[in-house]
């Protein structure tokens, strides 16, 4: 039985960091003579290869490197990978803004796909919502820079962040971690593995994060909640034969994030708010709050033969996202021009609070079939077929009511052939055809 329990407490992080820095440096010097070069194996081309043999700009991060580098979230990957900048969007809960080689997209709008793709367990996220996630339960992380349309079902111009989570082990095991800090911060997460007869296993996972804002609200004389996040998941693996297996996973999540706004009162009509006197304080009574609630389902079926592998991946994402802000009804808002070209405006009721909501419902369903060779000879290839259906519905109000529906139906065929000319040179040729 594999049992691991970890407790962490984050108090006075600056002092602790200064105290431990000399110890860390000393440990590195002591290990310098005994540490050698370790071969890094990546799966950028759907097969296990040495990173030196892959003609792709890829950075691979192991779970050990994540732990040693204190990389706990997908937002932290930019600390270890060059040419990568990651941060959470200004609005939206658990929505990521990813930039690779200067190509980025920083919005929660679903009608525009992000320039940097994120794939979790082989499923491409058609939106950047949900791109902020914990790295507690990962087997490997690879960051590929540049277009990857010949290797992945969904193409992106900036690159791909490819994350593979651990599969059920089929044995009893547990991994727990608890973190506490100031501003009432708490983070509890864990994984429980159990056998499923002698043919597979079950994995249960959970995570709960709560914390108050670092900004003190002078109107409420208190700190309001900043983040309240809860995620629960289950994964079932079944081995039909020695060479054929299936993994079915389901995740349910509920996130809430509150932004401590400091809004200039002259920002726009209908937006009454006070400007903060100090960046650590805010007088705003009703700040912007974002909610993200949904569920993900993934099915992966793999068949391994002597010199090839066939894999089928299905992914379903269904979630709702709400951005809400309360405003003070003063002034007016513009309606545009009338038929004579005269500006038209509508007055608001002075002294009335009203909420401005931006609701989005999003659902995507994807199917991908991959065929990957593993020949002993100089030639190998990867080929696949990819299908994606995604639709989003957005509504907003009450000041300016509007609705919009966006739909994507995409089918693609992709592939890449590599040939080793000799021990030094190799040739790789890829192609892709997409109908959308």
Residue ranges and their predicted role:
Residues 58, 66, 78, 141-146, ...:
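Non-catalytic regulatory/gating segments with a bias toward low-complexity or hydrophobic composition
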Residues 173-175, 180-211, 215-260, 295, ...:
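Transmembrane beta-barrel wall of Gram-negative outer-membrane proteins
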Residues 74-77, 97-101, 119, 140-143, ...:
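N-terminal periplasmic accessory domains that precede
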Residues 43, 79-123:
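Extracytoplasmic beta-strand/coil segments of soluble accessory domains associated
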Residues 245, 249-294, 356-360, 386, ...:
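Flexible loop and strand-edge segments within Gram-negative outer membrane beta-barrel domains
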Residues 1-69, 75-81, 193, 242, ...:
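N-terminal Sec signal peptide and the immediately downstream disordered periplasmic leader
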Residues 77, 108-109, 116, 121-147:
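Short acidic/polar hinge/loop motifs at secondary-structure boundaries
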Residues 131, 209, 214-222, 259-265, ...:
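Outer-membrane beta-barrel translocator domains and adjoining extracellular loop/strand segments
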């Amino acid at each position: 039985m594999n049992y691991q329990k970890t407790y962490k407490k984050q108090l006075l992080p600056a002092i602790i960091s200064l105290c431990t820095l000399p110890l860390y440096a000393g440990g590195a010097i002591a290990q310098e003579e005994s540490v050698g070069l370790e071969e890094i194996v990546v799966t950028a081309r759907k097969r296990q290869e040495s990173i030196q043999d892959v003609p792709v700009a890829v950075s691979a991060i192991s779970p050990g490197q994540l732990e040693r580098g204190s990389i706990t979230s997908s937002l932290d990957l930019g600390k270890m990978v060059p040419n990568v900048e990651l941060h959470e969007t200004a609005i939206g809960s658990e929505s990521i803004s990813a930039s690779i080689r200067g190509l980025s997209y920083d919005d929660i709008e679903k009608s525009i796909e992000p320039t940097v793709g994120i794939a979790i367990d082989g499923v491409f996220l058609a939106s950047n919502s949900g791109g902020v996630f914990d790295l507690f339960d990962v087997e490997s992380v690879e960051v590929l820079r540049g277009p990857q349309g010949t290797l992945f079902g969904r193409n992106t111009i900036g690159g791909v962040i490819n994350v593979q989570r651990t599969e059920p082990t089929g044995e009893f095991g547990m991994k727990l971690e608890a973190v506490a800090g100031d501003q009432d911060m708490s983070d509890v997460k864990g994984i429980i593995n159990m056998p499923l007869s002698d043919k597979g296993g079950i994995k249960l996972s959970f995570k709960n994060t709560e914390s108050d804002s670092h900004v003190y609200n002078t109107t409420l004389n208190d700190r309001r909640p900043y983040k309240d996040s809860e995620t629960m998941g289950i994964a079932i693996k079944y081995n039909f034969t020695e060479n054929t297996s299936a993994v079915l996973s389901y995740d349910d999540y509920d996130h809430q994030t509150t932004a401590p706004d400091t809004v200039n009162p002259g920002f726009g009509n209908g937006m009454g708010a006070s400007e903060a006197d100090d960046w650590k304080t805010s007088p705003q009574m009703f700040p912007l709050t974002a909610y993200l609630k949904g569920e993900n389902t993934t099915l992966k079926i793999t068949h391994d033969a002597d010199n090839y592998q066939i894999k089928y991946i299905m992914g379903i994402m269904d979630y709702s996202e709400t951005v809400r802000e309360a405003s003070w009804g003063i002034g007016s808002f513009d309606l545009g021009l009338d038929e004579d070209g005269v500006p038209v405006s509508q007055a608001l009721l002075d002294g009335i609070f009203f909420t401005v909501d931006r609701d989005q419902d999003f659902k995507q369903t994807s199917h991908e079939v991959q065929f990957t060779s593993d020949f002993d000879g100089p030639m190998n290839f990867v080929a696949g077929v990819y299908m994606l259906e995604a639709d989003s519905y957005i509504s907003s109000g009450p000041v300016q009511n509007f609705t919009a529906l966006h739909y994507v139906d995409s089918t693609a065929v992709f592939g890449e052939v590599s040939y080793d000319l000799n021990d030094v040179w190799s040739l790789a040729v890829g192609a892709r055809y997409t109908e959308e």
